[in-house]
Amino acid sequence: MAAAAPAAAASPEAPAVSGSADPETGDEDSREVRVLQSLRGRIYEAKNLLPYLGPNKMRDCFCTINLDQEEVYRTQVVEKSLSPYFSEEFYFEIPRTFQYLSFYVYDKNVLQRDLRIGKVAIKKEDLCSHSGKETWFSLQPIDSNSEVQGKVHLELRLNELITENGTVCQQLVVHIKACHGLPLINGQSCDPYATVSLVGPSRNDQKKTKVKKKTSNPQFNEVFYFEVTRSSSYSRKSQFQVEEEDIEKLEIRIDLWNNENLVQDVFLGEIKVPVNVLRSDSFHQAWYLLQPRDNGNKSSKTDDLGSLLLTLCYTEDCVLPSEYYGPLKTLLLKSPDVQPVSASAAYILGEICQDQKDAVLPLVRLLLHHNKLVPFITAVAELDLKDTPDANAIFRGNSLATQCLTEMMKIVGGHYLKVTLKPVLDEICESSKSCEIDPVKLKEGDNVENNKENLYYYVDKVFNTIVGSSVSCPTVMCDIFYSLRQMAAKKFPNHPHVQYSAVSSFVFLRFFAVAILSPHAFHLRPHYPDTQTVRTLTLISKTIQIIGNWGCQSRKKSRFKKSVMCEFLKMFQEERYFTDVKKFLDEISSTETKESSGTSEPVHLKEGEMYKRAQGRTRIGKKNFKKRWFCLTSRELTYHRQQGKDAIYTIPVKNILAVEKLEEGSFNKKNMFQVIHTEKTLYIQANNCVEANEWIDVLCRVSRCNHNRLSSFHPSAYLNGNWLCCQETSESTPGCKPCTAGIPADIQIDIDEDRETERIYSIFTLSLLKLQKMEETCGSIAVYQGPQKEPGYSKFTIEDSVATFKTIQQIKSTIEKLDEPHEKYRKKRSSSAKYGSKENPIVGKIS
């Protein structure tokens, strides 16, 4: 089940949440339901930011994405602009619970701390309402009130005390147990404490907890006592009875603060609980959501801060155990063999989905996982060709076939792009050479002839890199290209060039040209490039696309209207370019076996800057943790003093025994994990929870098949002669906790087939009305034996109404059976998260 419109992606698993139904026994607790969250979207641009006061009004801006206050993504810096254009796409799994998704716009400051200009904060429950829409959000001011987050666990009790002279005194016991999810202060865990006050018309008794160091989840466990009424006001007969006028006016107020020592303490939030919650029961326990101050100042000129354009798609999938998805998977995996293919479940999915792109990714991943993708794409591509009368228009549309093939290339071609394009793209992006050849767009001091030479050098280098890369082309891509080529030649026997166009329209137009134009979207570069580099990449991409197209045609001519581009393209009209294109297309569309994604070479999997704890040292202090550049390939994990420097330390992948999270209490640091290997455990701190989750996932995948993997581990560190988790003194003591369950071993393509099937179930569920319409259309065709004229008929491709009708019936039956365990889980989840629980804390006052 999904909380939003289906997202077009699924990635490594996130933490699981227990509780589902066993398909045989119906036992809700005997299986595990995984609740997987993901977020994708784009940060487009900001507009009308406040200028600096003074002659230099421009700002150097960047934007961050934060889960609550934890930064998980940062854009590039756009210099000297009050309307910065970022255009950065993002996708990540969300490995923990959160209250707010926030976007902060900063002004970069070299000498001082970066200045926060404003933010957009969206409650988790409101994310679905923005799904898939381009939306302008007004930037809101940032102060201590706007940064409030977290919750408090509180227990109240009313006791009766009898004095020596027989009078009765009422005593209020306030037990502040813990807080969870307090905000970060300057990117670090805070030093929180709480003040506990009993407030009334004529009293304000205040007490204070101890300060807890470096934690966002403090465990206070402190009890405070307050006298509710004067003992003289009561006699023995007033047992557990408080005067109404007193109890209605009294309240417990808890304020959370960050201890700043030398400067003023920072407000973290407050809650107010009326004492009359004890009127009917002398005991009350609940979690409360922290709130801003009642008198929090809200700016009346929030629009003046500027605005931010975003697209968001938040998805929450509740993935049941594998047994439930068997019937739906079977129905989908039969699709390549169904005649005609338009009557298959996979094709019908693409027909009824509101946005076909939503259906393509889970479908492609599922079919790819079961080696069914090549025959399915071949079948739907053949259907496309039936409706293509012009050989020059082959595979130019945006059909199910072209979308499936395009998505497949993104999935399996990632490493192919890295070994082919990344080195030359790095050279282009890190160079300051101008390649502008349009005199109208030239900057002052630029020389057209020099720029033309620069552009020619880059285009020629990119071209030679591409046409020399056929040996690295993934086998599954070659197999599909071979099928496309054969079908095209059969369809248009009098047009020999069309067999090349069928392949070129994908590998040049939809693969290489797009990756050159947007390297950040293919993980070839960390950020969207600057304006000059964007222009250079655009010119290179267009030229490569044209040359690739020329190699498939009998006559070579430019489609560019601008004489500037036409003149430049003449430099590439040598016969060798056309010959090299055809040779390359021949090689990647042959039936000869290729290396699967170039796996004879080490596969580059992940790299980035993190902190590692010095190994084998006992000294205590910040210097024990050093910033290092980590690099993981399919063969080894290394770390370096800086990117590009020689490795300081190398761990062969075959020596990794386990990769697990490390408890925060070990070093009082968040987002830590441990790489347990044959020599010594390596403790690493990631920059945020998303990054930590990604590193753990990829390290687990690459080492999953190691023969000596551990079955248990220590969740805390070994310090001062004992394990902090189990207090064992021997460092060689076996682990006290079972290792995390294994992750799919394919380091190239990590596919969670249950999650993909759950996505497809969600799409079918959201599209039932359209499925019903398609079913009715099939019935009408069968009854009237002729073409339909009713509205909406033309939206469906129905070649065999009887076969299509039968498949729709099977889909509906399968979906109905899956609805039952989903509904059971929804009810259980709803009932378990009662108001006042940690999962569903109380907001504001209760009476």
UniProtKB/Swiss-Prot annotation:
Compositional bias segments (type: Low complexity): 1-21
Annotated site, Arginine finger, chain positions: 396
UniProt modified residues of type N-acetylalanine: 2
UniProt cross-references to Pfam families, sorted A to Z: BTK (PF00779), C2 (PF00168), PH (PF00169), RasGAP (PF00616)
Database matches in Gene3D superfamilies: C2 domain, GTPase Activation - p120gap, domain 1, Pleckstrin-homology domain (PH domain)/Phosphotyrosine-binding domain (PTB)
Region annotation (Disordered) ranges: 1-31, 819-847
Keywords recorded for this protein, A-Z: Acetylation, Cell membrane, GTPase activation, Membrane, Metal-binding, Phosphoprotein, Repeat, Zinc, Zinc-finger
Boundaries of every PH domain copy: 603-704
GO terms of biological process kind: intracellular signal transduction; negative regulation of Ras protein signal transduction
Boundaries of every C2 domain copy: 19-137, 148-288
Compartment list: Cell membrane
CC per GO annotation: plasma membrane
Protein's name in the database: Ras GTPase-activating protein 2
Species name: Mus musculus
Gene of this entry: Rasa2
